[in-house]
Swiss-Prot record:
It comes from the Viruses. Its main location: host cell. Glycosylated. Residues 249-275 are cytoplasmic. Interacts with host PTPRC; this interaction affects T-cell signaling. It is found in: Host cell membrane; Host endoplasmic reticulum. Keywords: Glycoprotein, Host cell membrane, Host endoplasmic reticulum, Host membrane, Membrane, Signal, Transmembrane, Transmembrane helix. The gene is UL11. Coiled coil: none annotated. This is Protein UL11. Residues 32-227 are extracellular. GO terms for cellular component: host cell endoplasmic reticulum; host cell plasma membrane; membrane.
Amino acid sequence: MLLRYITFHREKVLYLAIACFFGIYISFHDACILVPAKVGTNVTLNAVHVHDGDYVYWSFGGGGANRLMCRYTPRLDEIHKNTNRSFSCLTNHSLLLINVTEEYTDYYRTMTTFVHQSHNWHNHGNKWTLDTCYYVYVTQNGTLPTTTTKKPTTTTRTTTTTTTKKTTTTSTTTTTTTTKKTTTSTTHHRHSNPKESTTPKTHVELHVGLGATAAETPLQPSPQYQHVATHALWVLAVVIVIIIIIIFYFRIPQKLWLLWQHDKHGIVLIPQTDL
């Protein structure tokens, strides 16, 4: 029965699958919070909107059960089985990366399931989930790569060549001198003279997330801003899915085409209905 329905409504099923894939793509490609870090320091990543009793999960990379690091349900569990990184799960639901190296450069995600009743004022209710993503970028000096403007310089080199030809005969001696031929070539060389970039002062420990100091991470958006952006993306995805379903379920493009043919040729065409 399902196969028969898909056969007769394959266009609708295809459009619906594309819309679902688009919604999933938006969900998994939210902009992550950028966290620059210096080799040998500690980095603290904070969960947002967390109360006692809420369920919090920390994972790295693409996430999933095999990459869990911390689990608060609400009892705290640290999972070091599938990771070679030194970290600690703090009692305030934060993740502490200890003595980071360049191998720590990765995505770190926190998923919070709201259980506490205090979330009802925000219309979240129970079992509502909030995802937050961080991208920790570890370098030797703790700064992001910057591009510098090159100032070219030009040097000129001139080469002069002179040719003299002398011809002599037996009866009459005639000396012929050709005109001096000078060839000048100019070659341009570019030399880069980049300006030296200044390295900002680093800190022993970097705190990121709700309540963190903004001076250490000037490029980092606030978690509240990411929360609003996630809501907006989901609303946009739902609206797009609804529009696509309405357009292709009621066959609006086909009906517009038939109306145009009727006005052009004066022929009444009856659209084929589904079986």
